[in-house]
């Protein structure tokens, strides 16, 4: 083999490009590519940027509704919330960086998703997160490392969000051994904008200037997009230099400068520099517009000496934006950003060539056609194979295991890391900044912010039961959409749209691709049935270490609108003597349940039945009854069943309860049948509520009050329950410090 060929193979390998990719690149260019061009193709055709393995499965997602202003394909999705305002939101992953460097990985994940939102012209008003960690309970190195990761990720999220002045108002955190080698950090941001003042990532108008704004460019994050498109091995700690370093104070200045700029008429288009940095932002803007672009890389503000064109194109330095502006507005734009102590430089212009032409001190260092890179990346229809494990686990039931006394099961489940209060996490976040948050964490099934401008409230919830997704990828993904929507409805808001973050293992494994394909089918089915279109999202693949993939984890965040910000429904008990109802049909359904995991020690069984009509009827009941003012609180009965839902309601409120649930088996108080809620009403409203419940099963459970929680044959004092609920998490996570 010639030395030249060896060098080419070495370069291709380091850029995760195949021989076929190289041949395709030569065909596109009509010549051999240089290193800058190889870097561009590598980044833009990476799994992270191109979605080449997932795109074929994402087609067909429902994306339209009368209230959808912008669906997938932009920096974030946009829905009309009435009164001239729009909610702009998106969810993205920062999994690989957070495993390598938890603080910076999580922090820059938060920073990146906020830029996606404010680049659309919206001021961020709420953050959520969905976090998955491995086993934190054992006294071994793996669990100790997971506890370290929890502490680092939470500190990173809080450190960035708090400095930005954007409240982090909720989220979801769960633990499973499948995440020992790959934690998942999914960040969500929602912003508020006027519905007729949305900005898009376009580069229209031949001759219009292309302007770089924000922080200077360094070498941090080089190769980040490619790193996030590969699985981990024992050597992955060496990837620390590929993790970006964030500066929230600079991002705060960038936010305010952009919002000031948006009040002018200077902006044609604007794009965040996220994964693949200047490469992705420039190619995406030109690609959407069908235009070309010239950029002079020596004009890009540099933070380090000796940087090359390759470095400038692929750096993932944070807090940067690319603008396409109206010609003649350059000086005024630069003045705005300099006022905010930020860099701004005219680095190029829009052309009609359809090519990206890059110059370095007057010399052309790259010329690549835009469309084949941004819009025509390879699409892979990877082989799929149904995993053999599904047949083995489908027949497993709780009757295959020795019975555990219900009281013992109740005591163990109230200490489950999935159940217990996560205030150790959310008290590190500023949840009340901007003064729009309605109630602190743990008091609502959804997280809610008021919209002062129109008197409404926005409710949001991020959810995914990964055990459901493991035993039934299609049904589990549908269940994630359902539960996320149900939590929003339990707060009194009407669910309107979702964003997703699809976290899966290695797509080169046919079983993983089958899980992914089935999950997409489940999301399509649920969103269509519930009329909650997908308006944006993210795919994160290669969540695998040493051949072990994470469980399918399609995180779903639903956003809904409550027409009256004064009628937000709590999820904990509100008053002594109030009546409790269980709405919805209960069966002995334990597949993928918390009970099976914690008490039986397995993740197995058949998923509880899904009935979209019953689900929508439940949502309508809660939303309409809340409008009439006859509800005191509503809580989704899901993980851990009715018993654990009641325990949580009691722990948060400080009020006990006495409940009697009709069951076929005493363990059914822990069963997880879907489309159920626990409702609290005042006695004088009982008849009205029962009348409204209509066709739904409505069982009177009992009453609120007392200093114990009792349901059927289990009970616990409020003192013990609140100790379990509020202190367990801290005891576990701070064990090493």
From Swiss-Prot:
Taxonomic superkingdom: Bacteria
Chain sites annotated for binding Mg(2+) 2: 116, 272
GO cellular component: cytoplasm
SUPFAM superfamilies (alphabetical): PurM C-terminal domain-like, PurM N-terminal domain-like
Binding-site residues, ATP: 51, 90, 500, 537
Keywords assigned by UniProt, alphabetized: ATP-binding, Cytoplasm, Ligase, Magnesium, Metal-binding, Nucleotide-binding, Purine biosynthesis
Family matches, as CDD domains: PurL_repeat1, PurL_repeat2
Catalytic site positions: 48, 94
Leading EC class: ligase
Signal sequence coordinates: none
Reactions it catalyzes: N(2)-formyl-N(1)-(5-phospho-beta-D-ribosyl)glycinamide + L-glutamine + ATP + H2O = 2-formamido-N(1)-(5-O-phospho-beta-D-ribosyl)acetamidine + L-glutamate + ADP + phosphate + H(+)
Gene Ontology annotations of biological process type: 'de novo' IMP biosynthetic process
Quaternary structure and partners: Monomer. Part of the FGAM synthase complex composed of 1 PurL, 1 PurQ and 2 PurS subunits.
Task performed by this protein: Part of the phosphoribosylformylglycinamidine synthase complex involved in the purines biosynthetic pathway. Catalyzes the ATP-dependent conversion of formylglycinamide ribonucleotide (FGAR) and glutamine to yield formylglycinamidine ribonucleotide (FGAM) and glutamate. The FGAM synthase complex is composed of three subunits. PurQ produces an ammonia molecule by converting glutamine to glutamate. PurL transfers the ammonia molecule to FGAR to form FGAM in an ATP-dependent manner.
Family: Belongs to the FGAMS family.
Name listed for the protein in its UniProt record: Phosphoribosylformylglycinamidine synthase subunit PurL
Species the sequence originates in: Sulfurimonas denitrificans (strain ATCC 33889 / DSM 1251)
Gene: purL
């Amino acid at each position: 083999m010639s030395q030249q060929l060896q060098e080419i193979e070495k370069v291709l390998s380091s850029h995760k490009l195949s021989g076929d990719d190289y041949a395709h690149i030569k065909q596109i260019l009509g010549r051999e590519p240089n290193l800058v061009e190889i870097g561009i193709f590598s980044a833009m055709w990476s799994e992270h940027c191109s979605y080449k393995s997932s795109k074929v499965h994402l087609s067909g997602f429902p994306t339209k509704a009368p209230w959808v202003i912008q669906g997938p394909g932009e920096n974030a999705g946009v829905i009309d919330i009435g009164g001239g305002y729009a909610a702009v939101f998106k969810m993205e992953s920062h999994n690989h960086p957070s495993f390598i460097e938890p603080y910076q990985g999580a922090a820059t994940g938060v920073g990146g998703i906020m830029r996606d939102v404010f680049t659309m012209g919206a001021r961020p008003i709420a953050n959520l997160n969905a976090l998955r960690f491995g086993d934190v309970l054992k006294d071994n190195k793996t669990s100790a490392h997971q506890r370290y990761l929890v502490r680092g990720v939470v500190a990173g999220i809080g450190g960035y969000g708090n400095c930005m002045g954007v409240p982090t108002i909720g989220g979801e955190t769960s633990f499973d051994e499948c995440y020992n080698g790959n934690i998942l950090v999914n960040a969500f941001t929602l912003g508020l904008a006027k519905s007729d003042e949305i900005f898009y990532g376009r580069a229209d108008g031949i001759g219009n200037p292309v302007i770089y704004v924000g922080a200077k460019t360094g070498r941090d994050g080089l190769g980040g997009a490619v790193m996030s498109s590969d699985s981990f091995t024992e050597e992955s700690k060496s990837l620390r230099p590929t993790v970006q370093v964030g500066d929230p104070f600079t991002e705060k200045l960038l936010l305010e400068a952009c919002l000031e700029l948006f009040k002018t008429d200077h902006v044609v288009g604007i794009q965040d520099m996220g994964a693949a940095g200047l490469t992705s932002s420039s190619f995406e803007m030109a690609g959407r517009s069908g235009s070309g672009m010239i950029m002079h890389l020596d004009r890009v503000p540099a933070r380090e000496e000796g940087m090359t064109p390759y470095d400038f194109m692929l750096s993932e330095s944070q807090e940067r934006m690319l603008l396409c502006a109206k010609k003649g507005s350059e000086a005024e734009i630069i003045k705005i950003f300099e006022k905010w102590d930020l860099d701004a430089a005219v680095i190029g212009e829009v052309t009609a060539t359809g090519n990206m032409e890059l110059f370095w001190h007057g010399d052309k260092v790259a010329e690549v056609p835009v469309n084949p890179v941004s819009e025509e990346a390879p699409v892979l229809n990877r082989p799929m194979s149904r995993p053999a494990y599904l047949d083995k686990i489908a027949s497993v039931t709780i009757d295959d295991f020795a019975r555990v006394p219900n009281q013992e099961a109740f005591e163990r489940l109230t200490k489950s890391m999935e159940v217990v209060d996560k205030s150790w996490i959310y008290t590190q976040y500023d949840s009340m900044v901007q003064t729009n948050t309605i109630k602190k964490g743990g008091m609502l099934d959804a997280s809610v912010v008021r919209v002062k401008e129109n008197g409404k409230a926005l409710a949001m919830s991020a959810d995914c039961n990964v055990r459901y997704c493991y035993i039934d990828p299609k049904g589990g993904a549908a269940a994630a959409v359902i539960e996320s929507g149900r939590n929003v409805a339990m707060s009194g808001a009407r669910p309107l749209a979702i964003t997703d973050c699809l976290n899966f293992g290695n797509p080169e494994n046919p079983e993983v691709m089958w899980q992914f394909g089935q999950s997409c089918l489940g999301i399509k089915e649920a969103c269509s049935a519930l009329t909650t279109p997908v308006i944006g999202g993210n795919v994160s693949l290669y969540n695998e270490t040493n051949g072990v993939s994470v469980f399918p984890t399609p995180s779903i965040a639903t956003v809904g609108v409550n027409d009256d910000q004064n009628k937000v429904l709590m999820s904990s008990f509100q008053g002594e003597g109030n009546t409790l109802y269980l709405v919805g049909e209960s069966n002995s359904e334990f597949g993928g349940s918390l009970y099976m995991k914690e008490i039986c020690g397995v993740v197995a069984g058949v998923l509880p039945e899904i009935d979209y009509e019953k689900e929508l009827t439940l949502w309508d009941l809660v939303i309409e009854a809340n409008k009439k003012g006859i509800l005191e609180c509503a809580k989704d009965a899901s993980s851990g069943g009715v018993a654990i839902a009641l325990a949580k309601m009691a722990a948060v409120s400080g009020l006990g309860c006495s409940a009697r649930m009709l069951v076929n088996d005493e363990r059914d108080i822990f069963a997880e049948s879907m489309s159920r809620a626990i409702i609290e009403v005042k006695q004088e409203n009982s008849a009205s509520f029962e009348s409204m419940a209509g066709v739904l099963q409505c069982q009177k459970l009992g009453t609120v009050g007392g200093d114990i929680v009792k349901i059927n044959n289990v009970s616990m004092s409020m003192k013990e329950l609140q100790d379990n609920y509020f202190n367990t998490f801290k005891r576990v996570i701070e064990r090493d410090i």
